[in-house]
């Protein structure tokens, strides 16, 4: 015999709330949600209104105990800062969600919506949503306070070079811009023989000094002065000064090495030409094309000076030029330059064209010179050389003329220059009238030497039409592939996307 069983739907049982008697599903507390919320407030102890400090000058928020950070409105960084203000009472509950409630940017109010959970009576978990109101209070940070009080810098770097030309400083300026080493500076001041960099902390100044040691041959001395002290907290306030001295050698200088240094560099001749100054001094012997690099420590151990300054450059015309194919190398000689060609030339001063006086010399510019070309050089035969190493040399080993570079029409080169460079924002005082000519010399060096401009950001000048890489005279030019577009990306006052805090 078979029995038919009826399928029955099971429904959960209900109980009555012990407070109000409303039928509810069973729970560990045996109480409805409404009554549980009326009896228990899990947000109790969490402040509903908190103040937060904001500096109007630098657009930064104060993060205890002593840090100022830059945050955009409704950003993750600002939300983390707001939650840290209530970190202690918030640790008693479980934070489920947090987010901003939109407010007017100028209202000086920040509202954060929090969702928290907490275990209450008999293991029941209660979830609650509430809003914390943050009042933005204006407070000037310590850095801005020192700026307004004209006592803002803690460290200064005084960069000096004892030369009559600023080619090294122009190159150093472009390296600073390329690698962004000027971002932490408070002020940059230019004087007639160097630059002063002001910083708000000694650590930033030390980082800049390390950068200078990696980019130019130099040495430095550090000193500090006590400004104030607090005997109760045992704190001291110092101002630090870093005196950086760059080697007094620039590109296109003619130098005379000491016999000991010349021998250590591969028995090269003492009279050399400086073809480049980077982290080391790059020299070339115009008689043999032998090259050598001298770092800062070697220079200060065996110092030498420039025999002539740029204002003593004279213009010569090439009368005859022949390439020297067979270069005799002495025993123990150093490296030979592959970018230059040794040539023997007869030249005559353009100021002495009415005479028959000509000069014979060897030069490293044999690949550039042809009869009739103009070239700039130093006349060592008719100038007074006041150098201890030259005075001890045999007069037969001192050349009459040292050629430096080929001469082109400067006006035409400026007119066809379709690129530009950026400059550091700095204060200037006691500027020389010769600065513009020196800057044009630096721009010409960039066009002529690819090794110098590879670490320089060159921007295309849209106002000048694009032409060929060389002009009618054969003057070198920078190709369009080496140029960057000059972009101007604007940011809001907070430094990121989002509305700015209006005060």
From Swiss-Prot:
The modification Phosphothreonine is found at residues 433, 470. GO terms for biological process: protein transport; ribosomal large subunit export from nucleus. It is found in: Cytoplasm; Nucleus. A motif (Nuclear and nucleolar localization signal) lies at residues 405-422. GO terms for molecular function: ribosomal large subunit binding. The modification N-acetylmethionine is found at residue 1. A motif (Nuclear export signal) lies at residues 480-489. Keywords: Acetylation, Cytoplasm, Nucleus, Phosphoprotein, Protein transport, Transport. InterPro entries: Nmd3, Nmd3_N, NMD3_OB, NMD_SH3. Found in a 60S ribosomal subunit export complex with RAN and XPO1. Interacts with XPO1. Associates with pre-60S ribosomal particles. Belongs to the NMD3 family. This is 60S ribosomal export protein NMD3. It comes from Pongo abelii (Sumatran orangutan).
